[in-house]
Amino acid sequence: PYEILEAIYHPIGCPPINEIIKPGQKVAFICNDPTRVANSFDFMPVLVNEMNKLGVKDEDMHIVFALGTHRPMTEEEMVEAVGKDVASRLKMYNSLCNEQEDFKYFGTTSRGTPVWINKHLCDVDHVILTGTIVHHYFSGYGGGRKAILPGCAAMETVRVNHSFMLDPAAGLGKTTGNPCY
């Protein structure tokens, strides 16, 4: 827990969590599906308890599992991912890319990508991305922002974004100019 607390109260390049989160706010956590190793069960209890200390109630937090185009997680897999304590306290949702009614439209990017994001991320004050950062063969890196796209985006958004993988600027470890990053 020390390392987790150190990371959230002394982060690199952003304010500490107690300067961002205020009492009574609503928070959504994005967690990985079983295809990505993240050990969420290690840090989610710490994050949820710290949110409580900062004045965020359990009923004002929830978890969205970033599935992208992968299969839904079972209830058992969700509990295993975040631990029994957290699973018993927070609502948990699969982000199912083919369930269009689960997404909110935000417009179209300059590259023509329609932006549909999971509705459970839209009516909160903060979205906290969890997981690991790894090299990705066309998106530059996996994890981080990829928790939102493709993780919590509708199929149409994912399909158009992934169509850019053949762009010469797409590639392993590339971020500058990479249309998929």
In which residue ranges do the predicted regions lie?
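N-terminal amphipathic/basic leader segments beginning at the initiator methionine
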Residues: 1-8
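Short acidic capping loops at alpha-helix termini that bridge into adjacent secondary structure
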Residues: 57-60, 88-89
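Extended, low-polarity segments enriched in aliphatic/aromatic residues
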Residues: 149-181
